[in-house]
Amino acid sequence: MSSYFVNSFCGRYPNGPDYQLHNYGDHSSVSEQYRDSATMHSSRYGYGYNGMDLSISRPASNHFNASERSRSYSAAAATTAAAAGPEAGADTRYNQPATSSPSPDPLPCSAVVSPSAGDNHHGIKNSIASPTTSSNSSSSSSHISRDGVGTSPGTEDDTPASSDPPSSQNGQSTAQQQPQIYPWMRKLHISHDSMGGPEGKRARTAYTRYQTLELEKEFHFNRYLTRRRRIEIAHALCLTERQIKIWFQNRRMKWKKDNKLKSMSMAAAGGGYRP
């Protein structure tokens, strides 16, 4: 609530401590920090700077639903005023009989949200307690929290908190079922899985044109590779040492076969030729 709206009521209503406190004796016995109307926290206790109750003018979207409870409070106050008379009707808002509702909080600036209901969830931090107020507050069913806001064990606000653990467990189970795939876990070569034959047989590796060209160039200069050279080629072509070794073995076998056929053809051609 803005200070502009609160200050507009300063000249119309008397000071807050001038009203008589019910069941708590004279207001002079209360601490000075609660008698001073300028130091009261309007947003927490529902009062303005002059001690006036502004809970009726609050919007319906606040945390305590003051608009609905204020209407029921006004109806109860009108009934009490009609029964007590015109003289007592002026102060019925601030002087309620003890039988209509449980005793309010021991602060003069605390707002009575719903006197007809027994579950008054309005907590106050560092409240001043007296022997009389302690006996009255023990019989009431109000729950006071340390943070300054009353909480109920069975409200709708507890359902999101109770539903958080299952959602977090579902997220963890989903993360466990779907492990993250890193780039080095993927296959770097194209393999014909359908042409692999039996399941126990290793799939045949299909080399790219660039890889085949580089391997052919290396085989042209040297048909046998050292361990260091094999590692260099494997890193350069993104292959493994085993693939390089097998490719060179197959290439040598092919080279020997070609040379053997070539020599045999040359021998046959030379034997049949008679100068």
From Swiss-Prot:
It is found in: Nucleus. Residues 200-259 bind DNA. Residues 84-177 are annotated as: Disordered. Residues 93-102 have a biased composition (Polar residues). One of its GO terms (cellular component) is nucleus. GO terms for biological process: anterior/posterior pattern specification. One of its GO terms (molecular function) is DNA-binding transcription factor activity, RNA polymerase II-specific. Gene3D superfamilies: Homeodomain-like (1.10.10.60). A motif (Antp-type hexapeptide) lies at residues 181-186. Pfam families: Homeodomain. Sequence-specific transcription factor which is part of a developmental regulatory system that provides cells with specific positional identities on the anterior-posterior axis. This is Homeobox protein Hox-A5.
